[in-house]
Amino acid sequence: MSWFNVLKKNEGWTGELSDKKKGLLKATPKMKVDIPKFDYPDNEKEIPAVLAAMKDKKLEPAEMKETDVNARDMFFDLVDDEEEDYSDLIKDLEIYTIREKVRYNRARPYQVSDKIEKPKTHTIDTPSFPSGHSIESFGIAVALAHKFPDKKKALMDVAEKVSDARVEMGVHYPSDKKVGKQIGEMIGKAYIREVMSDADS
């Protein structure tokens, strides 16, 4: 099935990007990362998995809120480092995230199924695929784990927690998380290779 036909079958995200997000689309990333082209996912087929995750929530409401709005803090609270020191990484994660989201323009689960209410959060002002929280979480986790190898498991656990929470909230599909994780790890490794290695030498 062609991309055009899939897009017709799965109506895209309906919303307006903020000026900040539009600005990121024009920005040039510091690191060159060759993001592969992914198959366009099927919204309807993934709705049951989203509903199941929402029903069997693993996180308490307070934890869910923290993963939604304070995800970065969860990583830097684990290590002796400051978020500001990773501004280039975070900016690139944001740039690549919005590029991919606009490229696929996938509708959010609540836009596809009337069984899912629109969540009360400001973190759904972009298309669904891939998950920006997953991209950022795994990108940061990979970079920090390189510098703090003794914290690797804890950092990766937080990345999984943040990513899973997005599906449990009903704002993402499982494939959003899966691909977001893959992209985040790619960017994190590029940062290690191109930035952290230079700093170490």
PLM features per residue range, with description:
Residues M169-V179:
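A structural-propensity feature for long, helix-poor, extended segments
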Residues M1:
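Extracellular cell-wall/glycan-interacting regions and their flexible linkers
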Residues F4-M169, M186, A190, V195:
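Hydrophobic alpha-helical bundle signature of multipass membrane enzymes
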